[in-house]
């Protein structure tokens, strides 16, 4: 594996070894799905209308932009990906794609997505998309991830852009409504990632990545609970602009209360984190975001 990684890192692996599936994996498709859904939410709740074709173009641009950010992330982090068990099967450390190919893929997708968004949709959404790619690829991946245990807190800004981009695709503006969804994702991100980081902290130690659990497990548990409570408050803010606020608040409160219950289970543990508690929170946090945004869509119309 080490020899293969060194070979691919220097860009000497034959391009013929790369398949379509390898490039799809390079773009982090699971994250892309969540990004696309939150962007579509922004479109659906925005005032006004958008031509279906333009809406489709905007959605594809957001997906490609997210893929570009993922490619840049794997390009830059290929050294630590090769060390961690959770990531050593990714295309670059596995020898399926070389670093130069990943860089080129990221550049092509980033340029194409922003350019098409500017020409076909509007300049506001294009600038926001460019900002999102830059935030994840440069601010989080290159500047924060290896330098501070608060990396995922500040880096969460990148993942919070999509609903704002979706809103701007329709209206060409920013708004408190779209910023409300931005805030939800921003606050949701730390407990979501810290839950899985608690289970993989030894790998982060080995890779010398200063995730918060590496420094203090107890502090991480406290922060998870704190952010979960803040999320419940922020998650209630769409009730200020939806058409059916009472229904929204009832459903959002139920979802947030369950989130807090999972966070409490993690917080109450002593010693080493358990798979049951941490994975329970991690998996539910994904359902939470999908369901909460679905409730926003349902209660706006």
UniProtKB/Swiss-Prot annotation:
InterPro entries: Protohaem_IX_farnesylTrfase, UbiA_prenyltransferase, UbiA_prenylTrfase_CS, UbiA_sf. Its EC number is 2.5.1.141. Disulfide bonds: none annotated. The chain crosses the membrane at residues 34-54, 55-75, 102-121, 125-144, 152-172, 181-201, 222-242, 247-267, 280-300. It is a multi-pass membrane protein. It is an enzyme of class 2 (transferase). It comes from the Bacteria. GO terms for biological process: heme O biosynthetic process. GO terms for cellular component: plasma membrane. GO terms for molecular function: protoheme IX farnesyltransferase activity. Converts heme B (protoheme IX) to heme O by substitution of the vinyl group on carbon 2 of heme B porphyrin ring with a hydroxyethyl farnesyl side group. Belongs to the UbiA prenyltransferase family. Protoheme IX farnesyltransferase subfamily. Carbon 2 of the heme B porphyrin ring is defined according to the Fischer nomenclature. This is Protoheme IX farnesyltransferase. It comes from Anaplasma marginale (strain Florida). The gene is ctaB.
